Amino acid sequence: MSVVTGGGEAAGGGGGGGARVFFQSPRGGTGGSPGSSSSSGSSREDSAPVTTVAAAGQVQQQQRRHQQGKVTVKYDRKELRKRLVLEEWIVEQLGQLYGCEEEEMPDVEIDIDDLLDANSEEERASKLQEALVDCYKPTEEFIRELLSRIRGMRKLSPPQKKSV
């Protein structure tokens, strides 16, 4: 069973559910400046600057790596919270419909963004009926409730890069 929340990076995995945000630390280790050595005993103020073309290129490359490590993703937390509550409700309802725990549930994929992309309520209901075709219990009430819950929601937009 999976509830898909959006594009590739924000998709809920097999059992985790919910959008995931990954943070990457800058390359270069424990936070010391690249190229500095703690064993030399001299501080940066004491050492003379080296101004060669090769050194400048190396520093520029290290700065690029550092900037790549500092890029963070900013999501609308309120929208993510709504989405998470909805996903938890869906998992609970599917458990009742299929009469089993989440781990034992057949693979049912309900893509919320796909439903929000649909042109009409009828198209959304049709997609949900298709996803729940193997369910032996009546699904009309679940579909009606899910459609009413997503009515005010927006599709999760691709993550925006925060300015550094």
UniProtKB/Swiss-Prot annotation:
This is Protein phosphatase 1 regulatory subunit 14C. It comes from the Eukaryota. The main inhibitory site appears to be Thr-72. Has over 600-fold higher inhibitory activity when phosphorylated, creating a molecular switch for regulating the phosphorylation status of PPP1CA substrates and smooth muscle contraction. One of its GO terms (molecular function) is protein serine/threonine phosphatase inhibitor activity. Gene3D superfamilies: CPI-17 (1.10.150.220). Inhibitor of the PP1 regulatory subunit PPP1CA. The modification N-acetylserine is found at residue 2. Detected in heart, muscle, spinal cord, hippocampus, hypothalamus, thalamus, midbrain, brain stem, cerebellum, brain cortex and olfactory bulb. Belongs to the PP1 inhibitor family. The lineage of its organism: Eukaryota, Metazoa, Chordata, Craniata, Vertebrata. It comes from Mus musculus. Residues 50-62 have a biased composition (Low complexity). It holds the Pfam family PP1_inhibitor. It is found in: Endomembrane system. The modification Phosphothreonine is found at residue 72. Residues 1-70 are annotated as: Disordered. The modification Omega-N-methylarginine is found at residue 27. One of its GO terms (cellular component) is endomembrane system. Keywords: Acetylation, Membrane, Methylation, Phosphoprotein, Protein phosphatase inhibitor. The gene is Ppp1r14c.
